[in-house]
């Protein structure tokens, strides 16, 4: 790993600002994810429903982790991908340290409905993934649905996934951070996420929305995606009553969190996991053009070689300030996600090729890459937004 150094408040539907903020303290019941069968820590199914179940690595912190799912609605914005809906909706998962997860079911990575949709979408959004043979509904996370949080306030981190990915594909890192004492909120961005499941129907949309992104995404679509994500993150801060947070995001999510750091003083620090800092035409984002006086980590891989990424990152680094760059060796773009652990299992099962694995996550053993990514992100926030122990 190498190193280079160099609001406006909106109305919140569905429960109101006070209720949403209380969610972070565990004082208000929230919409919970469908239950999954419980099992011992570190266990997971090998084969289920005729397909191969794949396991996520256990968290490393001293706390068990509880999970709740929340539906947030911003009536002040329309959805840019589906204007007929009339509002902008988000789905988020709130992960918090808990004294014990005993007696509470493990949260599935994907609900049965989302897994069914993702099975069809997987080889389209990520061409190296198998079209059959993987039972995406069988994978359990290490968070416990409905487990009560520890009392008191804790620093909050928000996660924005990459374009074409759902928040579910960032579960492992988020749960690990929560096990070390942070409250972590993973955010779906409906319209560009692979699939987002809602608790109800609404005129203009089905219970599960799928991605509008296509391989030939143009410059205008990329700009809409980033602008919408930044607005989503800022709305989530409004909705949850937060005033000093950390953000981290992968790919397009990394782009969004870096720009949100620039725009919103409530963001104390951010981690950009291999996201561009310019628009598709090469015009620098304001954060890269003007620099930042708040901590920002730029983390990349040696497998994702891209002149555009390097140019936009170096433009920001040239300003100096509390910005650092790190690089993971023998890795590629999706090593920062759950795919770091899942893809090698799919390859071992004969469902992916070695070349497909290398193009997605690199050749590094997940027993090395997963701890490396966790330590990288955790140590950054431990310095700039430490969690109580």
Model-derived features: where do they sit?
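Alpha/beta-hydrolase-fold serine-hydrolase catalytic core, especially in secreted/extracellular enzymes
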Residues: 45-47, 52, 57, 330-333, ...
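Short substrate-entry loop that stabilizes the transition state in hydrolases
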Residues: 147-154, 159, 163-196, 305-306
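Domain-level recognition of soluble alpha/beta enzyme cores
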Residues: 44-157, 358-366, 382
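N-terminal secretory signal peptides and thylakoid transit peptides that target proteins
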Residues: 2-20
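C-terminal region of N-terminal signal peptides and the immediate post-cleavage residues
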Residues: 26-52
